[in-house]
Amino acid sequence: MQILNDKSYHTISEDIARPIEGRASRAWWIAFGITLLATLWGIWAIWVTLRDGIGARGLNKNVGWAWDITNFVWWIGIGHAGTLISAVLLLFRQQWRVAINRSAEAMTIFAVLQASIFPILHLGRPWLLHFNLPIPNQYGSLWDNFNSPLLWDVFAIATYFSVSLVFWWVGLLPDFAMLRDRALKPFQKKIYSLLSFGWSGRAKDWQRMEETMLLLAGIATPLVISVHTIVSFDFATSVVSGWHTTIFPPYFVAGAIFSGFAMVSLLLIILRKVCKLEAYTTLKHIELMNTVMLVAGSIVAVAYLTEFFTAMRSHSEFEQYVFHNRATGAYAWAFWTMIICNIVLPQLLWFKKLRRSITFSVCVALAVCVGMWFERFVIIVTSLHRGYLPSSWTMFSPTWVDIGIFVGTLGFFFLLFLLYARSFPMIAQAEVKGVRGQGTGVREQESLNSYLLTLTSPEELLDKIKELKSEGREIQEVYTPFYVHGLAEALGLKRTRLGKATFLYGLIGLFFGCWLTYFTMIKDWPMDIGGKPNATFWQNLPAFVPVIFELVLYFAAHLLVISFFIRSRLYPFKKAENPIKKSSDDKFVIQVRDKK
């Protein structure tokens, strides 16, 4: 898919660097002020919670999970689209992702940060957070309960956050190098030198990076599915009416993709206008994102119908009452808001004209974000506020502290995104250059030094390499601004062994996960939980699978990235080795051994 038709490589660099190198606009400062005020309100609400305790919130004897867990699940869902765009679409070679993946990855990281705030505060004593980690403590052999879905959450979300972070960071190395070589101020140059890890764009480094990104995509794909699946287990493994259902895992995953793409679409529509990136995030990209939202929304609609049909055919009066209460009870307004926002409005995306309408896309994206929040609210609150004893029935109403924390996370999320837009490239310039059409970029005359050949296109580069090899010249190194397909073969580079190493790293995670769960739950401190004694490892293995699975992915991803850095000799403050700065922008350099 052609991203551009009339942009040179240098123009792409100029366009993407402009929001970072230019002065912040008045609109940016206004948005910064608003988001900062919202963040400060959230900080005040958190301080009140820590000072007065959970009683400052709207929780009561029935609805112990309400605002916090609703917001937690919603933010985790928002964070799903970034890794999905980066990983799944990369594996399927969908080139349209390159204009949106970098901002989507940043959105994932910022959203997961917001999500982590709510369960930490919900602990009641957040200063004892470290008790959720399997580390020795002053109580002797008191370990975490690996049979608990709440602990599965800790491992799943921590793994998801860290893998998404390294995935994002590795992809940013060429972008940081481009900004480093363009920087005029010494402080900026030092910062981007630190962030780029001395990236020089050598051919072998590009080969390793391409394989590393593919392997990370392969690791992140099951991780994306596992995270919201495990989040759904918080509800599905309970015996609460309205929660105890097997449809929750796929239902939650589809809903996460739905809300995540809605937030990505909303952010990118705003950014393309404010930062003048219409040539990169085109109407075609918006149409494709709306298509994904249409598919995900249709799956969510089917899940709603399936969930309702299952409850009605269950012959359980308690299950039937929960769904009847949702549609006609005290929170019916929330239920029907969910239906309109998540089912009715997105189905209008069947019309191509509406899929390509900026105004309608913004409206649908906002509606889906609102609707998916109400979905989580309906699932949690309406299943709890009417229990088995009518005498204990109650209503939940959020306090200003509840509202303040949620508004604070919204403000902090957009505040981070504003700072990101002023400091980091919002578009993966190296990937955009690699998939652009045949542009009319400015050609510079080929310059020959004693050992350098400077070229202006990948086609010229490959032709020159063939010519030099036919002349018997020794090519010492090649530097390119982006990954050039066919370059490794032209230079005769051997395939890396990162794939085999990643498999071994996954085995290390498997053995560590098995040992950890066996030692803590079976050998050192066996516990009888709910009448289920931890007698043998194999009897309890199904409950240990989520933690073991996450540790396999954690070890495989992080040790892979460490191996990539070591093999490519990349580290903070390393001095870049590219002989000319333009090799990170729009020039292709061949370093040839002088015959002298």
Which sequence ranges carry the predicted segments?
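Transmembrane-helix bundle segments that line or gate the permeation/cavity pathway
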Residues: 2-7, 46-57, 62-65, 72-203, ...
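Cytosol/matrix-facing juxtamembrane amphipathic
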Residues: 448-488, 528-544, 559-596
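N-terminal signal-anchor module of multipass membrane proteins
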Residues: 1-78, 414, 418-420, 431
